[in-house]
Structure formats: structure tokens, C-alpha cells
């Protein structure tokens, strides 16, 4: 029979849909398994094959676990709020809702063509009002807990995007979205108090089965530092607080430096220096954080005209303002120890400030005894503990743990996001909306551009913003900021547990059944964004008794990048691969322009993405699924090669022909069964270990050996087909029915492996003629002596031709010698 995936795959996809084959049930008598992909943002570009690596891996695990008797939750949804749809709306006037709907339809079609076994009934988008009603409700829960608040703060403002960005959305002074310049400005914002959970988030990492590099990224981002909070007296009513991890260097302090955003600068600055300080602050506000902290930047600063008293020496320490100090970590003030800190030394050299050595080459304290303060000779922690104890007695300092982590800047000046469900009143108070007022929908608008700095598009809709509040009978003003894209993805995994609940975001019963997520697969780029934010929300819910587990994701795997060849005209941009020409090892365009050829991450911008539908049309989804795994270990970068899909298609052709041939018989064949049992055992082990890249080659090795048999055991093939089903489900379903079984191969269960077949029963015989080695012969050790001698004669037939065998020497499991 001929293998035609175009017919087979559509047939079985329709069967699964009609029979709701992948519907997840909360079945008490079954163990559960929750396997989840980081759900995608439905962009206009659609999916390329690089996106399918992780999705294929989770689908293999989901199908395997169903076959093993688990109740499996394997859902898919859409992280559909976000900036690209809004930017498209600004350019075209098309409502983001319409763009998003169209993109989701395309994504759904692409995923369906791959045969992924999602529970379609649980699908939702974060932009569905039925979903973000609960996102708004959960935000209000955080507000009631004191974890959501408003404050004036220095923010990352991107003029090109027209919105404020969280620290996690800025890299090297540029927006991660689009790579636009970001500057610091003061703005009143909604903020989530993630720092209140810094220690819990840090400790919780220890028990997670996550890649160590992701855990380390979160540790570094949280940035726990143990040190001291020191107070430097400015006058009798005012102190400046400084956090330091090196209190042992206190006697080397010769100046203090404040961040330009520090709120107390205006109270400290002298009238003579006020104009210069204010000018410097304005200049600093126009710089990105990357510019300010650059190691190659010449240090700048301005003297405030004020001094602080050194806690030990009593010296007057000049107080400066410099943009190399960033507000938000520590207290926004640093103590200048130029002899032992490179940045401080550069600053001291720039402004001719004293440099006092207080540590020797072995880090022992020197030049640090003053009166009853005796620090000389002490080292490291002992020295720091002495300083802290001395200052604490005088109310000038204490031990302090600080975190690099900032509270999460939560509001955005955008349209396409969840409206924040708060009403503000003229007296400065505000009211959270009640349950019967949710969801709060955004108004329909024509102009999606921000109104100006600090005001999103919603601020322009006066009839929506300015209201008469029916609950209080007072005039009020709706909040015009929206939530960030991360809000909906902070808790979506919980909604999948109970996607149709209209009374609550999830029920306790369903949450207790499904949580935590057993396997979570997605990109490492979310290490300090989505993964940290969702852990924070989950910790809050856990403390409140809303969820049963302290952590949401038990095991995490980051799939590696998929690389593909890109072609670029230097200084101009990328060209499509079909426009590239090779001539004597050089690549050019059709017009002769020289090209740079690289192996880069597959992406739309580099024009090197591969549309999976093209490969499905040519080779079939099962072949594409097999190659997606065969291309390399799941967590490693891999180079995509379309020819590899062709090789997997050839294997499937061969397997289909073998399984549908007349040689398939209902017989008991020990050799065929042994091959099948060993394959099933190997495939099961590889799935459990997530060594999915070795599975295709195991099947190829199997068929090479199995095809040598004269007849093919139906029982052996039924095992192999069931083992193939997780990775190539369409052909497996088809062959399962061809072999005479009822449709629905997942329901047939995973084949039971008999340990007796796993023993190595092969024996290598040395075949000699007159004592000379002429051949080697692999035989099953249970083969009869007569059959072994027959096979041995055949293996050395050319040496026996026209000769009389005088004697046959047979040594069991070792040797056959023909004496002529």
C-alpha cells in the first residue's frame, strides 16, 4: 500500500476533533499529568518551524502519558494582549481585536496541521473579556493585600513606543521590543510590591527541577546582598542612609554621591550650587541607564554645597550628585571609597578628591583606628561585624539585607491591555471596582496613539474617563493606564485547570487536582520576566490559600534556538534565500551584490524562517515532527535542514510499506518480538529522560533489522506502532486500524515490555575452515545446533565448494570448524 500523508493526516485530525480525543478529565482514579507550553503571542508572521520544536516535544510527552494511563492536561491558548497589534492599529486604523482574531485563526490552523493533541475546549485568549475579567479581579486582590500601589518614580520611558517599560523590558538602554532608546523620567505609576517576596522567590528556586542557568539568572536578578545600612549625619535633623556590602572600608570614605533622582537633593543643596545641580539633573534625565553606568564613560558630577559628618573620624564629607549612581538599588546614595573601588577612584580623580588606603594586599584593615574604634588588623566578615556593632550602639547603622530586585512597574500607556479597574476621586482617594462591575472594557476608539508623556490612548476618551460613580454618587475619573502584557500570562496556567468557570478564576477542586504544572517548556528569554512574575503571583495566592502549591512549574525545559542560513547585504539588510546565488564559493544576489552568509536564529526579520505548511505539504506532518526531534537535543541550539525532513519521510514510507505488506502474519516470532520489546523499552526510557532526539534513529535501526525477517509478527508490529504514536501519530493511527484494531491508538495503552526480551540472547560464532577464520556469525543462543551448522555452512560456502567435509567441530556459543 502507498503512504499518502495528505489523506491520512486530515482523516485522523478530523477523527480526533469529532471524538474529542484529547479532552482532559479530573479523574480521581487516574494519576494526573499537566504538560504546558509557554503560550504564544499570535503575531501576524505566524509560526515558523523553530516554534514547533517545543510544541512537538510537549505533544510527545502528552501522548505518551495518556498511553501510560495518566489523565493528561495539555492545553493551548493565546497571550494576545501586546504592543505589536497596537502598533499595527496606529499604522492602519485596524482595531487590535480584529488583527488578533485573524492571527489566532492562522496560528490555530498551523498547530492543527501538526496534529498536536490539545484539549481545544480549554482554549482562551488573554484579550477575551471573559478571561481578563479575572485578571482584573486578581489585580484587585493584590491591591487589597497592599501589594499594588501608586507612586511617583523614575521610570524607563520610550518615546518611540509612547509608554513606560519595566526594568526587565529594557536591555542596555534600549527597549527589548523594537530596540528603541529609553530615558529616565519621573511619573506616577502603578507598582506591584514584588520585593516583599524577594526572599521567598530566592529560596523557592532550590527545590525546582529547572535549568541551573535559569535559576542563576533569577538569583542574580533578585540580587540578594548582605551588608550594612549606615547613617551619615548632615545636620541635627537629617541623615543620609547608605547601603554598603563593605562596611570594613568605612574609614576610607572621603565623599558621598547621590543619584540625580534622589528625593532629598533639593533639601540639601546650597543656594550657591542650586542652579548647577538642577542643570545637571536635567541633563542626567536625558540619558539612558546604559549611558550612565557605562564603564568607558568619563565620570561626571556636581557638588551640592553640603557636607555630611563621617561617623568615625568626624571629617566633613562633601556630598556630590553623579549619574553613575542609580536610584532604586540600595538607598540611592553611595559612600565614595576611591582607594578600593574603581568607579569611586575614577570619580575622585576627576574632581581631585582624597584617596585613603584602608586595606592592605591581604584585605586586612589598616589606617582605621580612631579613639575607641579599633579596626586595624581585622579582616573580612570579622571587620564588618565590628563596624556594624560599633555603629549600632550609636544608632548610626545596622546590619541590612538588600535586593537588587525593584518593585514591578505595572502600568502602561497603551490601549491594547487590561484596563486597570480603579476609579480616582478629586480628594485623592480611589475605589476598586466591585465584582458586578467587571470586566471593565476599554472604549472603542479611532486613534490608538498615546496622548502624550504619561498618558495613554484611553486618556483621550473623555466620556469614558470622566464618570459619575453610581456606587458612591461622586464624580470620578477612571484609571487610564493599562496592565502590561505580562499580567495575563502571570496566571493563565491556573485558568487552564478550570477554563469555563464563570464564578471564579478557578475552583479549588480543579486546582488541587492539576497543579503544579509537571512539565513546562518555553524559551530561556523569559527567565526574569514571565517566569519570575508568575512565581510572584503564585506565591501570593499560596499564602492566601487560593492555590495548593508554593510553586507553579515543577519541571522547566528551555528549548534551544533553531538556526537557519541567512543572507545579508552588508550595510543594507537581509534578502530572501531564493534571491541568493552561489558561484565558486561566493554568495551574491541576482544583481551581483556580495552577501554575508550566516547561521542565525530563525526569525521573520532575518528572512530565514521556514513555513511549516510548506514542509507539511511536501513531506507530511509526521515527517516534520520526527525531524523536529531528530535535529538535535531539545535544550541545545540546532541548525535546521529541510533535507532532514525528507529522510524522515523515507523512513515512514518504508515502515508503512512493511506494516501493510503480505508478510505481516499472526505468528509467534521470538526474534521479531525481541526487537519490538527492546525498541519499546528504549523509546519509553528516552521519553522519560526527554532524550527525544534519539528516538527517530532507534526506529530506523529497528526497521533495518526487522525488515531482514522473512515474516513480520503482527503482535510485534502492534507494539511498535503504539510506540511510534507519540512522535508520528497520524501514520500510527492509520496502521493501527490496518492491523485490525479499533481506532483511537491512545486508548490502547503503552505496550508492556517483557524483561526476558531485554536480555542479550545473541552469540557470535567464529566460523573456521581447516582452523582458519573465514567468517563470523551472529545467532540467537537458543538456536538449535542443526540450524547453526546450516547457517555456518552457508556463510563459508565458497570455501566448501566442491570439497568434502570430513568433520564438523561444534563448540556451543563459540565456534564452528569445518575440517576438509
From Swiss-Prot:
Root EC class: ligase
InterPro entries assigned: aa-tRNA-synth_I_CS (IPR001412), aa-tRNA-synth_Ia (IPR002300), Leu-tRNA-ligase (IPR002302), Leu_tRNA-synth_edit (IPR025709), M/V/L/I-tRNA-synth_anticd-bd (IPR013155), Methionyl/Leucyl_tRNA_Synth (IPR015413), Rossmann-like_a/b/a_fold (IPR014729), tRNAsynth_Ia_anticodon-bd (IPR009080)
BP-aspect Gene Ontology terms: leucyl-tRNA aminoacylation
Reaction(s) this enzyme catalyzes, per UniProt: tRNA(Leu) + L-leucine + ATP = L-leucyl-tRNA(Leu) + AMP + diphosphate
Motif ('HIGH' region): 40-51
Compartment(s): Cytoplasm
GO CC terms in record: cytosol
Keyword Transport: no
PANTHER family in the record: LEUCINE--TRNA LIGASE, MITOCHONDRIAL, LEUCYL-TRNA SYNTHETASE
Family the entry assigns: Belongs to the class-I aminoacyl-tRNA synthetase family.
Name recorded for this polypeptide: Leucine--tRNA ligase
Underlying gene: leuS
